[in-house]
């Protein structure tokens, strides 16, 4: 059994297995060591935990966990959300609600690294970013769909979204006489949906920027080269508490911008970057790296890495550096500034 003396500030240590209807709550009294493992209906969870003193509560960082964490914090409890992959090794028995709740408890007392609990503003930014990503995906799918259909009628559309928007109306109108009216009408409807998506994306982006600019480090992130409004919004959510990452390198590794390595017998081999990461933010950072590489104001370090490494490797290296710089400005609470070059 874990040493409970280190948790003497809490009345109980609790592990909760979240569900849609019935929650499983595993608790241990820090004074007596008494253990309970009971089911509680969803609408009774807050009531059952309202009058049990200050508790340390652990939950898996899964769907609705942020909501429950804020509700439990409002009751005066301390809440730690933990990555489900880190909790799984602590589940000792066959899969069941009781075993899951017990596993969450053991992960909690073992000191598994916690995920930050988002504020309501951070939650709203995250939700809007998710909505924006879906709209961008839908818009891209529709554009490619229209581009493929128009190619069957001899029209080759430009790759740029702006150029596509300027040319597509003319191409659809030129189909008069070459295609049946239903084809033309359907293409026009699809193009209208594309424009509607673009308008919604712009509306979401304005609100995302407005909310993100209310956060503490928004203006600091925008001083980092290559960081724009969208990356800044992601960083405001992810680095609201930069101390959850022990170093800039750990943050870059979390984003999948550090290559994996393997080996044994004293020989280590560096391989590709991992696939399990925040791919949306990593993609945006790589896009920012491309923009920085094209900039006339790029630093000497960027010029050197572009000259020495293959282009894609260089882009990941620049994105890695951007992520580290974002962590640094969030940790220090100050703008990014270029380090002066000193003579040897």
Functional labels for PLM-detected ranges:
Residues 80-119, 123, 127, 168-170, ...:
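Short alpha-helix plus adjacent loop in nuclease-associated cores
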Residues 7-28, 104:
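Gly/Thr-rich phosphate-binding beta-strand-loop-beta motif of the actin/hexokinase/Hsp70
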Residues 220-223, 229-312:
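Phosphate-backbone recognition surface of nucleic-acid-processing proteins
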Residues 129-220:
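Glycine-rich, often acidic, oxyanion-interacting loops/wings at catalytic, nucleic-acid
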Residues 3-11, 202-227, 235-238:
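Extended, structured, electrostatic nucleic-acid-contact surfaces
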Residues 266, 304-344:
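Low-complexity, acidic/Ser/Thr- and charged residue-rich accessory regions of DNA metabolism proteins
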Residues 31-55:
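Nucleic-acid-processing active sites and adjacent nucleic-acid-binding tracks
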